Curated annotation (Swiss-Prot):
PANTHER family: NAD KINASE. The gene is nadK. The keyword Hydrolase does not apply. One of its GO terms (biological process) is NADP biosynthetic process. It comes from Aeromonas salmonicida (strain A449). It catalyses: NAD(+) + ATP = ADP + NADP(+) + H(+). Its main location: cytoplasm. The active site is at D73 (proton acceptor). Keywords: ATP-binding, Cytoplasm, Kinase, NAD, NADP, Nucleotide-binding, Transferase. It holds the Pfam family NAD_kinase_C. NAD(+) binds at D73, G74, N147, E148, H158, R175, D177, T188, A189, Y190, S191, L192, S193, Q249. One of its GO terms (cellular component) is cytoplasm. The lineage of its organism: Bacteria, Pseudomonadati, Pseudomonadota, Gammaproteobacteria, Aeromonadales. Its EC number is 2.7.1.23. This is NAD kinase. Its cofactor is a divalent metal cation.
């Protein structure tokens, strides 16, 4: 097959029977068609593959042209935070629940995948956020987020106080359960559950969504994605186990008086889709919107 992709990485959901079946089928399909197939180490161990083509996510990103992620959106998010640092295209086979980011059905993924491998696909780039925690002016920790960065308390049902600055300008102070800073990709995730607006993927925008604020006037706001969001945590907070959560998978410790900077990352996730992909079809299907009347 004459393909724009020569080296393909397989990344998956370890110890998941359905995902393992799909990964095994993909490995056989790709190797018999002459592709160089690299396998994520956790997946390889589960499938019993032990050779020089087994490697970690960073090595996969350095060597692969295309990465196929088999699992749910959580698996895609974990892989995407690493793969976004490299010029590698990513497509997903859904073996999770909603599957906003994993286009291909596990029942009939071969035909659309074959079209993608032959060079017939749609391509898009999704920006990520970078969240960093500063303490007494020193950068203590940082990470990337595909969906959202969330400041939240460490104690259940315990409000925290903080100030919000946009590009250095004070916006408001807030007493709440925290705040969500979401990308367009993340606007259909935690942000949506908290009452935030859905942002279409091509928008250069982010949304700030308060979490149970102790006021009737605080509402979500949409900002230019090139804005720098600064959260100044009140030193009077009694909770010393606060966190910034990136995609619900990576946590950064936050203490009273800390400062959190959230801004658009220089890294982008390169997604590829089948030619019949439609973002609004995905929304309609995943969120249960009404179908056409006539």
């Amino acid at each position: 097959m004459d393909s724009p992709f020569k080296t393909i990485a397989l990344i998956g959901k370890p110890h998941h029977e359905g995902a393992n079946q799909t990964l095994t089928g993909l490995h056989q399909y790709l190797t018999t068609r002459g592709f160089k197939v690299l396998v994520e180490s956790r997946v390889a161990h589960t499938l019993g593959i032990m050779d020089e083509n087994v490697m970690d996510l960073v090595q996969l990103g350095e060597q692969a042209d295309l990465a196929i992620v088999v699992g749910g959106d959580g698996n895609m998010l974990g892989a995407a935070r690493v793969l976004s640092r490299f010029d590698v295209a990513v497509i997903g086979v859904n073996r999770g629940n909603l599957g906003f980011l994993t286009d291909l059905s596990p029942q009939d993924y071969l035909l659309p995948l074959e079209q993608v491998l032959s060079g017939h696909y749609k391509s898009e780039h999704r920006f990520l956020l970078e969240a960093a925690v500063y303490r007494h002016g020193e950068r203590k920790s940082s990470n990337l987020a595909v969906n959202e960065a969330v400041l939240h308390p460490g104690k259940i049902a315990h409000m925290i106080e903080f100030e919000v600055y946009i590009d250095g300008s004070f916006m408001y102070s807030q007493r709440s359960d925290g705040i969500i800073v979401a990308t367009p990709t993340g606007s259909t995730a935690y942000s949506l559950s908290a009452g935030g607006a859905i942002l279409t993927p091509k928008l250069n925008a982010i949304t700030l969504v308060p979490m149970f604020p102790h006021t009737l006037s605080s509402r979500p706001i949409v900002l230019d994605a090139d804005s720098e969001v600064r959260l100044l945590v009140s030193p009077d907070n009694q909770d010393d186990a606060m966190q910034v959560s990136c995609d619900g998978q990576v946590t950064l410790a936050v203490h009273p008086g800390d400062e959190i900077l959230i801004k658009k990352s220089k890294h982008k996730l390169h997604l590829v889709h089948p030619l019949d992909y439609s973002y609004f079809h995905v929304l309609r299907n995943k969120l249960g919107w009404g179908s056409k009347l006539f």
